[in-house]
Amino acid sequence: RAVVEDPPSSAAPPEPAKPLFASDEVIHLTIQGPVDVLARGGPDSRNVVPGTIGVNGSQDVLPIQLALRGITRRERDVCQFPPLRVVFTAPPPAGSLFAGQHKLKLVTHCRAAEAFQNYLRLEYATYKLYNQLTPMSFRARLVQVDYVTAAGSPIISRIGFFLEPIDDVARRNGMREAKVGERIPVAQLS
Protein backbone atom coordinates (compact mmCIF):
# COMPACT_ATOMS: atom_id res chain seq x y z
CA ARG A 1 0.00 0.00 0.00
CA ALA A 2 2.71 2.46 0.97
CA VAL A 3 6.45 2.54 1.36
CA VAL A 4 8.74 3.83 4.07
CA GLU A 5 10.87 6.90 3.57
CA ASP A 6 14.07 8.20 5.14
CA PRO A 7 13.82 8.56 8.89
CA PRO A 8 13.15 11.98 10.35
CA SER A 9 16.04 13.56 12.24
CA SER A 10 14.49 12.54 15.56
CA ALA A 11 13.89 8.93 14.50
CA ALA A 12 13.77 6.37 17.26
CA PRO A 13 16.16 3.43 17.02
CA PRO A 14 14.87 0.36 15.17
CA GLU A 15 12.55 -1.92 17.13
CA PRO A 16 12.33 -5.72 17.09
CA ALA A 17 9.38 -7.41 15.40
CA LYS A 18 6.23 -7.78 17.50
CA PRO A 19 5.52 -11.30 18.87
CA LEU A 20 3.25 -12.32 15.98
CA PHE A 21 6.04 -11.79 13.45
CA ALA A 22 9.00 -12.87 15.61
CA SER A 23 8.73 -16.55 14.61
CA ASP A 24 8.07 -18.64 11.50
CA GLU A 25 6.19 -21.38 13.36
CA VAL A 26 2.74 -22.03 11.88
CA ILE A 27 -0.06 -20.81 14.15
CA HIS A 28 -3.29 -22.81 14.41
CA LEU A 29 -6.23 -20.42 14.84
CA THR A 30 -9.97 -20.47 15.06
CA ILE A 31 -11.89 -17.51 13.68
CA GLN A 32 -15.53 -17.60 14.69
CA GLY A 33 -18.20 -15.30 13.31
CA PRO A 34 -20.42 -14.82 10.26
CA VAL A 35 -17.44 -15.26 7.94
CA ASP A 36 -19.51 -17.17 5.39
CA VAL A 37 -21.97 -14.26 5.14
CA LEU A 38 -19.13 -11.73 4.95
CA ALA A 39 -17.38 -13.66 2.15
CA ARG A 40 -20.53 -13.44 0.02
CA GLY A 41 -20.57 -9.64 0.41
CA GLY A 42 -19.09 -8.71 -2.95
CA PRO A 43 -16.58 -6.08 -4.09
CA ASP A 44 -18.51 -3.06 -2.80
CA SER A 45 -19.34 -4.51 0.60
CA ARG A 46 -18.33 -2.34 3.54
CA ASN A 47 -19.82 -4.76 6.06
CA VAL A 48 -18.01 -5.20 9.33
CA VAL A 49 -19.00 -8.20 11.42
CA PRO A 50 -18.15 -9.19 15.00
CA GLY A 51 -16.22 -12.33 15.72
CA THR A 52 -13.56 -13.93 17.85
CA ILE A 53 -10.07 -15.22 17.22
CA GLY A 54 -8.28 -17.78 19.32
CA VAL A 55 -4.98 -19.58 19.11
CA ASN A 56 -5.78 -23.29 19.26
CA GLY A 57 -4.56 -24.82 22.50
CA SER A 58 -4.85 -21.49 24.32
CA GLN A 59 -7.62 -20.25 26.58
CA ASP A 60 -7.32 -16.75 25.10
CA VAL A 61 -10.19 -15.91 22.76
CA LEU A 62 -10.09 -12.30 21.66
CA PRO A 63 -12.98 -10.20 20.32
CA ILE A 64 -12.45 -8.93 16.78
CA GLN A 65 -14.22 -7.29 13.90
CA LEU A 66 -13.87 -8.72 10.41
CA ALA A 67 -14.17 -6.97 7.06
CA LEU A 68 -13.33 -7.79 3.47
CA ARG A 69 -10.19 -6.18 2.09
CA GLY A 70 -8.28 -6.09 -1.13
CA ILE A 71 -9.27 -4.94 -4.58
CA THR A 72 -9.20 -7.64 -7.25
CA ARG A 73 -9.63 -10.53 -4.82
CA ARG A 74 -12.91 -9.03 -3.60
CA GLU A 75 -14.45 -9.77 -7.00
CA ARG A 76 -16.65 -12.92 -6.83
CA ASP A 77 -15.32 -14.24 -10.15
CA VAL A 78 -11.77 -14.03 -8.76
CA CYS A 79 -12.16 -15.20 -5.14
CA GLN A 80 -14.97 -16.97 -3.36
CA PHE A 81 -13.26 -16.26 -0.04
CA PRO A 82 -11.56 -12.83 -0.23
CA PRO A 83 -8.81 -11.54 2.08
CA LEU A 84 -9.92 -10.28 5.48
CA ARG A 85 -9.10 -7.36 7.72
CA VAL A 86 -8.94 -8.45 11.36
CA VAL A 87 -9.42 -5.61 13.85
CA PHE A 88 -8.99 -6.23 17.57
CA THR A 89 -11.79 -4.44 19.43
CA ALA A 90 -9.68 -4.27 22.60
CA PRO A 91 -5.89 -4.31 22.93
CA PRO A 92 -4.66 -7.93 23.13
CA PRO A 93 -3.05 -8.78 26.50
CA ALA A 94 0.69 -8.16 26.89
CA GLY A 95 1.56 -11.88 26.95
CA SER A 96 -0.58 -12.68 23.91
CA LEU A 97 0.77 -13.66 20.52
CA PHE A 98 -1.22 -10.68 19.23
CA ALA A 99 0.26 -8.19 21.74
CA GLY A 100 0.76 -4.79 20.14
CA GLN A 101 -1.53 -5.53 17.21
CA HIS A 102 -4.67 -3.58 16.33
CA LYS A 103 -5.43 -4.13 12.64
CA LEU A 104 -4.08 -7.03 10.59
CA LYS A 105 -4.37 -8.11 6.97
CA LEU A 106 -5.17 -11.81 6.60
CA VAL A 107 -4.41 -13.27 3.19
CA THR A 108 -6.88 -16.11 2.65
CA HIS A 109 -7.17 -19.15 0.40
CA CYS A 110 -9.41 -17.41 -2.19
CA ARG A 111 -11.02 -20.66 -3.39
CA ALA A 112 -11.50 -24.08 -1.81
CA ALA A 113 -9.53 -26.12 -4.40
CA GLU A 114 -6.13 -27.45 -3.29
CA ALA A 115 -4.42 -25.55 -6.12
CA PHE A 116 -5.33 -22.30 -4.37
CA GLN A 117 -3.60 -23.51 -1.20
CA ASN A 118 -0.48 -23.93 -3.33
CA TYR A 119 -0.85 -20.43 -4.80
CA LEU A 120 -1.11 -19.08 -1.27
CA ARG A 121 2.04 -20.99 -0.25
CA LEU A 122 3.88 -19.45 -3.21
CA GLU A 123 2.73 -15.96 -2.26
CA TYR A 124 3.84 -16.54 1.34
CA ALA A 125 7.21 -17.87 0.12
CA THR A 126 7.65 -14.70 -1.93
CA TYR A 127 7.31 -12.57 1.20
CA LYS A 128 9.77 -14.81 3.08
CA LEU A 129 12.26 -14.65 0.19
CA TYR A 130 12.03 -10.87 0.11
CA ASN A 131 12.68 -10.85 3.88
CA GLN A 132 16.02 -12.55 3.11
CA LEU A 133 16.91 -9.78 0.67
CA THR A 134 16.05 -6.79 2.84
CA PRO A 135 14.71 -6.01 6.31
CA MET A 136 12.63 -3.28 4.65
CA SER A 137 9.97 -5.78 3.71
CA PHE A 138 6.69 -6.99 5.16
CA ARG A 139 6.97 -9.91 7.52
CA ALA A 140 4.40 -12.65 7.08
CA ARG A 141 3.19 -15.34 9.49
CA LEU A 142 1.65 -18.54 8.18
CA VAL A 143 -1.56 -19.66 9.89
CA GLN A 144 -3.83 -22.67 9.70
CA VAL A 145 -7.31 -21.25 10.24
CA ASP A 146 -10.44 -23.11 11.25
CA TYR A 147 -13.30 -20.86 10.13
CA VAL A 148 -16.45 -21.39 12.20
CA THR A 149 -19.90 -19.77 11.90
CA ALA A 150 -21.24 -17.59 14.69
CA ALA A 151 -23.37 -20.59 15.74
CA GLY A 152 -20.26 -22.80 16.02
CA SER A 153 -20.60 -24.86 12.81
CA PRO A 154 -17.36 -25.50 10.90
CA ILE A 155 -17.08 -23.71 7.55
CA ILE A 156 -13.65 -24.69 6.26
CA SER A 157 -10.07 -25.12 7.47
CA ARG A 158 -7.39 -23.56 5.28
CA ILE A 159 -3.97 -21.96 5.45
CA GLY A 160 -3.52 -18.22 5.21
CA PHE A 161 -1.05 -15.66 6.44
CA PHE A 162 -0.97 -12.40 8.33
CA LEU A 163 0.97 -9.44 6.94
CA GLU A 164 2.89 -7.08 9.19
CA PRO A 165 1.31 -3.60 9.31
CA ILE A 166 3.20 -0.91 7.35
CA ASP A 167 3.79 1.23 10.46
CA ASP A 168 5.44 -1.76 12.16
CA VAL A 169 7.70 -2.30 9.12
CA ALA A 170 8.71 1.35 9.35
CA ARG A 171 9.27 1.31 13.12
CA ARG A 172 11.25 -1.93 12.93
CA ASN A 173 13.59 -0.18 10.48
CA GLY A 174 13.86 3.11 12.38
CA MET A 175 11.78 4.88 9.74
CA ARG A 176 8.26 6.18 9.25
CA GLU A 177 5.48 5.47 6.80
CA ALA A 178 5.56 7.54 3.63
CA LYS A 179 2.38 9.44 2.87
CA VAL A 180 1.37 8.60 -0.67
CA GLY A 181 -1.67 9.44 -2.75
CA GLU A 182 -4.54 7.19 -3.67
CA ARG A 183 -4.31 4.38 -6.20
CA ILE A 184 -3.89 5.39 -9.81
CA PRO A 185 -6.85 4.19 -11.89
CA VAL A 186 -5.91 1.64 -14.56
CA ALA A 187 -7.34 3.93 -17.25
CA GLN A 188 -4.62 6.50 -16.46
CA LEU A 189 -1.81 4.00 -17.05
CA SER A 190 -0.81 4.13 -20.69
What is the predicted role of each segment?
Residues 2-190:
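Phosphate/dinucleotide-binding and metal-coordinating scaffold of catalytic cores
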